[in-house]
Amino acid sequence: MQDECHNCATTAENAVEEIFKVMEMVMQHFRNMNPMVLFDMHKFHDKAFAKFMEHKNIFLLDVISTNLKRGVSEGYFRQDIKIDILAKFRLESMMLAFNMEAFPPVKYNAAEVTIIVIENFLYGLATASGFKLIEQYKAKKNTIHAQ
């Protein structure tokens, strides 16, 4: 997964495209993933869960922070955002799809929940030029998925 995240960042033309590449990666992973996996890992596999949390709190937090800084420097994300707070917010919001009380798997698709949360997060960061770029990537994504 680290290689995939790195690939998303290095092949993307900008911070917005990077997030859309990440969303596509998330869709691929979540298609074959049981939402119970984190619950079971936490309950039955302490060491594996601790390793996952370490990965989340160090690697993923850095990836998100770097993307936010990139978006600000490119002019697609607002200058006034608090990167440290929003990076942690984004990190924790990733876990929402696995909260079975909030989003029971019989009613909600984890990939869809994640994509909706990411898109709304992205709109909240965007400048006017960022908003236009988001709309372009969404239209492109919707065209590809409609085929």
Pin down the residues of each PLM region.
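Hydrophobic/aromatic residues within well-ordered alpha-helical segments
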Residues: 1, 22, 26, 56-60, ...
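Hydrophobic alpha-helical connector segments
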Residues: 3-36, 87, 114
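Secondary-structure edge/capping motif, primarily at the C-terminal ends of alpha-helices
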Residues: 5-8, 37-41, 101-104
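All-alpha amphipathic helical-bundle segments outside canonical DNA-binding/catalytic cores
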Residues: 16-17, 55-56, 73-89, 107-116
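Short, well-structured alpha-helical segments
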Residues: 20, 65-68, 83-91, 95
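A short secondary-structure junction motif
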Residues: 29-34, 67, 71, 93, ...
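Short secondary-structure transition hinges
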Residues: 31-65, 72-76, 80-85
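C-terminal peripheral helix-coil segments that are non-catalytic and often amphipathic
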Residues: 66-70, 74, 104-147
